[in-house]
């Protein structure tokens, strides 16, 4: 079974979503199915079929969350240090063409949110940064083309 690296915050978020889906969504959906079933003929009961579809989607997501949680390798970023980029690092980059500064934290796949400054360990940018030191220049091939960045800071939250 392949381990899934994630931060403590990412692990907590998965646990919270699992709890919500099991303790709030599941009972709500079961209630909706019961209510729709009370309306009679199930073959033409759109409410019933919609609730059953929701149930299927919710149970599928619960199974996915349970799998991710069971395979999670929680990495305590606060115990990491150094100036080499690795999982959990918050990296400040400067685009060598535009001089634009960007800050990214390298996190697990399920935690990634580019708008919030968190990129997946498997993203092209993170793969290019891993193992590089502060002061290094890296070239990243993205869907928008090749970009060159200088690593100006590596910190650990």
Swiss-Prot record:
One of its GO terms (molecular function) is RNA polymerase binding. Keywords: DNA-binding, Transcription, Transcription regulation. The keyword Membrane does not apply. It comes from the Bacteria. Pfam families: GreA_GreB (PF01272), GreA_GreB_N (PF03449). Gene3D superfamilies: Transcription elongation factor, GreA/GreB, C-terminal domain, Transcription elongation factor, GreA/GreB, N-terminal domain. InterPro entries: GreA/GreB_C_sf (IPR036953), TF_GreA/GreB_CS (IPR018151), Tscrpt_elong_fac_GreA (IPR006359), Tscrpt_elong_fac_GreA/B (IPR028624), Tscrpt_elong_fac_GreA/B_C (IPR001437), Tscrpt_elong_fac_GreA/B_fam (IPR023459), Tscrpt_elong_fac_GreA/B_N (IPR022691), Tscrpt_elong_fac_GreA/B_N_sf (IPR036805). SUPFAM superfamilies: FKBP-like, GreA transcript cleavage protein, N-terminal domain. GO terms for biological process: DNA-templated transcription elongation; regulation of DNA-templated transcription elongation. NCBIfam families: greA, PRK00226.1-2, PRK00226.1-4, PRK00226.1-5. Belongs to the GreA/GreB family. Necessary for efficient RNA polymerase transcription elongation past template-encoded arresting sites. The arresting sites in DNA have the property of trapping a certain fraction of elongating RNA polymerases that pass through, resulting in locked ternary complexes. Cleavage of the nascent transcript by cleavage factors such as GreA or GreB allows the resumption of elongation from the new 3'terminus. GreA releases sequences of 2 to 3 nucleotides. This is Transcription elongation factor GreA. It comes from Azorhizobium caulinodans (strain ATCC 43989 / DSM 5975 / JCM 20966 / LMG 6465 / NBRC 14845 / NCIMB 13405 / ORS 571). The gene is greA.
């Amino acid at each position: 079974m392949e381990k899934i690296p994630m931060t403590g915050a990412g692990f907590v978020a998965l646990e919270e979503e699992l709890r919500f889906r099991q303790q709030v969504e599941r009972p709500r959906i079961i209630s909706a199915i019961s209510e729709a079933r009370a309306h009679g003929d199930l073959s033409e009961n759109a409410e019933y079929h919609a609730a059953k579809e929701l149930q299927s989607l919710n149970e599928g997501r619960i199974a996915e969350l349970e799998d991710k949680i069971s395979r999670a390798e929680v990495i305590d970023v606060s115990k990491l240090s150094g100036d080499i980029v690795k999982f959990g690092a918050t990296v400040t980059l400067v685009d060598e063409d535009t001089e634009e500064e960007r800050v990214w934290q390298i996190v697990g796949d399920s935690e990634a949110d580019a708008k919030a400054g968190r990129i997946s360990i498997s993203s092209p940018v993170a793969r290019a940064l891993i193992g590089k030191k502060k002061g290094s220049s890296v070239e990243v091939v993205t869907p928008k083309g090749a970009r060159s960045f200088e690593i100006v800071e590596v910190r650990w939250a």
